[in-house]
C-alpha cells in the first residue's frame, strides 16, 4: 500500500522521467497544442465560420449528466433512447405559445412549477415574441434559460377546427423527412470472427449497419428503423436482424396521440412503467429524482428489447385516458423444452446458439392509465397485465431468488404531483400481484430566491417485481430490493457561481447482484460551477461512494469464510471550457480516482484530455480529442462521454494505461445532405490482449470507424 505522497511522486516520475517514447511524445503534443491554442486562437479571425453550436453542446451536456459515472458492468441500462429523445426534441422544438404543461415537462431543466409559470405568464400577460422572453417568467434565470433554449421555439400554427383535419396542410404542418444510413466497424480482427460457427464463432461480418427513414409533422409521425449488430448475418438488403416501425397521430385536439407499431411507455415516477432511458444520480442534483413522465410515445431506438409493439392511445385534456396493447417476441435462454430464463435485453443474435433461441418467447402486455389534472398538480393511476407464452424460471443464485417466475404478472400504481407555494410534492406507490411493492415520496423546496432543495425517500421491497419499471435509486434498471434517503441542494452564490451537492444513504434488504447477504452504503457529490461569461465555463466536482461488499477471508483454523467490508471510491474532476470564437471551442478535463477494496487494497487512476471543436468552414465541423489515462486496475477505471455520429451514444470506460484519440467530422454538403465520419483508436502500453471471449483482440490497439449519411427535407 502506498501513501498519497508516494502516489503523487510516482505519478510525476511517470509523466516526466519514465514515460515510453510514445507517451512522452503524446504528452508533449498535448501540452504544445493546449498552450498554443490558448495563446493564438483568441487572435484568429475565421471569416467563413461564425456558427456557435450551442444546441449540440447543450444536448451533449444533458446526456453527460445522465452518464455521470455510469458503469455498464453493474447493470444493463438503456440510454440510447434518451439520447434520441433529446436529439428529436432539439430538432423539433416545442412552440411555447401553444404547448401545455405536459409537453413542457419533457424539457430537461423544467419541473412542474416552471412549466405552470410559463403557461400562466402566456395566458395572463402576453404571448411570447421570442424564447428569450422566458427570462421574465418567475423562477427562470439565465442558467435555466440557457439550458432549455435549444428545445423551445416561438411560432404560429393553424388554429384547430372540425374541418381542419380534412385539410392536407394540417397534416403537413412543419413537416420533415429524415433518412440516414450508418456503417460502423472495429478494424482489428476479434476472436469471434476467427472461430468456426460450430465452435461458437460469429456467424456474420463485423460490420454494424443501421438505417432509418422517418417523416414527422406537428400531427403525424411515420418511421422505419432497421439494424444489424456486429457478428449478425445480413444475407440480403431486407434481411436485417431487427426492424422497428410505427404510424402515429399526435397533438390532434383531445386525441393526444394514437400509435400503431412500436412505442414506449413512461408513467408517474417510473416505479411500475418506464421504458427507455432516464437520468440517474449525477450533477443535476435537484431535478433527477423527480421524473417528468413522457406518457406513450413512438419508439425509434435500435434498442431491440426495450419498447412495446402493438397499439397505444391517449385521449383527453384535464382528464386523460391512456390504453395500450403489445404482442411481441422476445429472446430468452432455454432451460429445457418448457422453461426459459427471463428475456434478455442485449438483442444480439451472432452465434449459432444465440440464433437458435432468437425470438423464442412470446410476450403479451396490456395496460392503461387515468390521469386527472387539477390547478396545482395531478393524480394518476396506472396498471398492466403481462403474460409469457412459456413459463419463466428464475436463477438459483442468492440474488436471483426474488426474480420473476411463472407466466403472468400484473401491477398497479398511483402517483401524484402537487404544488403548494414554494413546495412541490411528488411520489408513487406501486404493487405487483406476487405481493411485492414499492414506494417513492419526495419534496422539492424553494429556500429563498437562490436556493433549491429536494428530499426523497424510497423503499422497493425485495419481492417487488417491476419488470417494466425504472425508478430512481442506487441500482440502475428495474427497481427492487432497495431503501434509500436522498437529499440534494443547489445554491446560486451569484449569477456566475453555482454550488450543488447531494447525499444518498441506501441499503439493500436482501442479497443484491454478486452479494449473498444484505448490504448498505452511501454516496455524496459536491459540484461548483463558475461561468464568468458565455464563452468561458469551469467546474470542479468531487464524488465519494461507499458500499458494503463481500470478500473471502481465512480464519485462525485456515478455513475460508465470507465477510463484509467497505468498497470505497473517490472521484475528483476539473473541467474548463472556452469558446475562443464562434468557430473554435476548447475543452480540457482532468479526472482522478481513488478506489479501496474491502480487503483494504488501494488503487489510483487518472484521465486527462484535450478536446477541440472547430469550424474550418461554415458547413464543416470537426471534433477531436486526445486522452491519456493510467489506472492501477479495473477498480480505478475512468469514464468519458464522447462525440459521435448522430444518434450514437458513446461513453468510453478506460482502465490500465494508454491513450485514446478520436476525430469526428460533420460536413453539410447541401441543405438536404449531411455526412459524418468518426475514426477512433485506443492504444494500451501495458497490454497485449484486449477484451476476452469472442471480442478478444490480440494486440495493444483497438480502432473503430463509423460513417453516416443523412438526407432531410
What are these language model-derived features?
Residues 1-28:
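N-terminal secretory signal peptides that target proteins for export/translocation
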Residues 30-42:
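Bacterial N-terminal signal peptides
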Residues 73-87, 124-127, 135-172, 267, ...:
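Alpha-helical interaction/regulatory segments in DNA maintenance proteins
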Residues 166-197, 215-224, 258, 286, ...:
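Transmembrane beta-strand segments of Gram-negative outer membrane beta-barrel proteins
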Residues 202-206, 363-375, 379-394, 403-713:
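Exposed, low-structure sequence patches enriched in small/polar residues
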Residues 227-242, 298-304, 356-359, 430-432, ...:
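Outer-membrane beta-barrel proteins
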Amino acid at each position: 500500500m502506498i501513501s498519497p505522497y508516494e502516489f503523487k511522486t510516482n505519478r510525476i516520475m511517470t509523466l516526466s522521467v519514465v514515460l515510453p517514447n510514445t507517451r512522452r511524445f503524446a504528452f508533449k503534443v498535448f501540452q504544445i497544442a493546449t498552450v498554443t491554442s490558448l495563446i493564438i486562437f483568441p487572435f484568429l479571425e475565421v471569416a467563413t465560420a461564425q456558427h456557435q453550436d450551442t444546441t449540440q453542446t447543450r444536448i451533449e451536456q444533458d446526456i453527460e449528466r445522465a452518464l455521470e459515472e455510469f458503469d455498464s458492468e453493474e447493470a444493463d441500462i438503456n440510454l440510447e433512447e434518451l439520447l434520441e429523445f433529446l436529439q428529436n426534441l432539439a430538432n423539433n422544438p416545442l412552440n411555447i405559445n401553444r404547448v401545455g404543461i405536459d409537453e413542457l415537462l419533457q424539457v430537461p431543466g423544467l419541473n412542474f412549477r416552471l412549466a405552470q409559470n410559463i403557461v400562466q405568464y402566456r395566458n395572463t400577460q402576453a404571448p411570447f415574441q421570442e424564447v428569450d422572453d422566458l427570462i421574465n417568467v418567475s423562477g427562470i434565470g439565465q442558467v435555466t434559460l440557457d439550458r432549455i433554449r435549444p428545445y423551445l421555439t416561438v411560432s404560429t400554427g393553424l388554429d384547430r377546427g372540425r374541418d381542419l383535419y380534412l385539410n392536407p396542410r394540417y397534416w403537413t404542418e412543419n413537416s420533415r423527412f429524415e433518412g440516414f444510413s450508418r456503417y460502423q466497424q472495429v478494424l482489428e480482427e476479434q476472436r469471434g470472427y476467427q472461430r468456426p460457427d460450430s465452435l461458437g464463432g460469429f456467424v456474420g461480418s463485423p460490420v454494424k449497419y443501421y438505417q432509418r427513414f422517418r417523416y414527422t409533422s406537428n400531427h403525424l409521425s411515420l418511421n422505419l428503423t432497421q439494424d444489424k449488430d456486429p457478428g449478425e448475418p445480413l444475407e440480403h438488403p431486407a434481411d436485417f436482424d431487427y426492424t422497428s416501425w410505427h404510424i402515429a397521430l399526435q397533438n390532434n385536439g383531445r386525441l393526444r396521440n394514437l400509435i400503431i407499431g412500436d412505442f414506449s411507455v413512461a408513467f408517474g415516477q417510473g416505479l411500475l412503467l418506464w421504458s427507455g432511458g432516464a437520468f440517474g444520480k449525477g450533477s443535476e442534483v435537484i431535478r433527477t429524482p423527480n421524473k417528468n413522465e413522457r406518457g406513450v410515445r413512438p419508439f425509434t431506438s435500435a434498442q431491440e428489447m426495450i419498447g412495446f409493439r402493438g397499439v397505444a392511445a391517449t385521449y383527453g385534456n384535464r382528464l386523460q385516458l391512456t390504453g395500450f396493447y403489445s404482442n411481441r417476441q422476445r429472446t430468452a435462454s432455454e432451460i429445457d423444452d418448457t422453461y426459459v430464463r427471463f428475456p434478455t435485453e442485449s438483442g444480439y443474435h451472432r452465434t449459432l446458439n444465440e440464433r437458435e433461441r432468437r425470438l423464442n418467447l412470446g410476450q403479451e402486455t396490456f395496460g392503461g392509465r387515468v390521469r386527472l389534472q387539477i390547478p396545482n398538480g395531478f393524480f394518476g393511476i396506472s396498471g398492466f397485465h403481462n403474460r409469457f407464452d412459456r413459463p419463466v424460471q428464475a436463477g438459483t443464485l442468492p440474488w436471483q431468488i426474488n426474480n420473476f417466475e411463472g407466466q403472468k404478472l400484473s401491477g398497479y400504481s398511483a402517483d401524484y404531483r402537487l404544488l403548494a407555494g414554494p413546495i412541490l410534492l411528488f411520489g408513487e406507490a406501486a404493487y405487483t400481484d406476487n405481493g411485492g411493492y414499492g414506494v417513492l415520496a419526495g419534496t422539492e423546496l424553494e429556500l429563498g430566491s437562490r436556493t433549491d432543495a429536494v428530499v426523497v425517500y424510497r423503499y422497493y421491497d425485495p419481492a417487488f417485481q417491476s419488470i417494466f419499471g425504472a425508478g430512481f435509486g442506487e441500482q440502475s434498471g428495474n427497481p427492487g430490493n432497495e431503501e434509500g434517503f436522498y437529499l440534494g441542494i443547489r445554491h446560486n452564490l451569484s449569477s456566475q457561481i453555482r454550488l450543488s451537492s447531494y447525499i444518498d444513504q441506501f441499503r439493500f434488504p436482501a442479497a443484491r447482484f454478486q452479494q449473498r447477504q444484505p448490504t448498505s452504503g452511501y454516496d455524496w457529490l459536491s459540484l461548483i460551477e463558475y461561468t464568468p461569461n458565455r464563452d468561458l465555463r469551469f467546474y470542479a466536482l468531487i464524488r465519494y461512494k461507499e458500499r458494503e461488499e463481500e470478500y473471502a477471508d481465512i480464519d485462525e483454523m485456515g478455513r475460508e469464510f465470507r465477510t463484509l467490508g467497505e468498497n470505497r471510491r473517490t472521484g475528483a474532476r476539473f473541467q474548463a471550457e472556452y469558446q475562443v470564437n464562434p468557430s473554435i471551442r476548447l475543452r480540457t478535463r482532468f479526472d482522478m480516482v481513488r478506489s479501496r477494496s474491502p480487503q483494504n487494497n488501494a488503487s489510483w487512476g487518472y484521465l486527462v484530455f484535450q478536446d477541440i471543436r472547430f469550424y474550418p468552414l461554415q458547413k464543416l465541423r470537426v471534433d477531436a480529442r486526445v486522452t491519456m489515462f493510467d489506472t492501477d486496475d479495473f477498480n480505478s477505471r475512468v469514464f468519458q462521454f464522447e462525440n459521435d455520429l448522430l444518434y450514437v451514444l458513446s461513453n468510453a470506460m478506460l482502465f490500465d494505461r494508454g491513450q485514446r484519440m478520436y476525430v469526428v467530422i460533420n460536413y453539410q454538403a447541401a441543405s438536404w445532405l449531411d455526412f459524418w465520419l468518426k475514426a477512433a483508436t485506443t492504444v494500451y502500453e501495458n497490454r497485449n490482449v484486449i477484451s476476452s471471449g469472442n471480442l478478444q483482440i490480440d494486440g495493444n490497439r483497438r480502432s473503430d470507424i463509423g460513417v453516416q449519411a443523412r438526407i432531410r427535407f
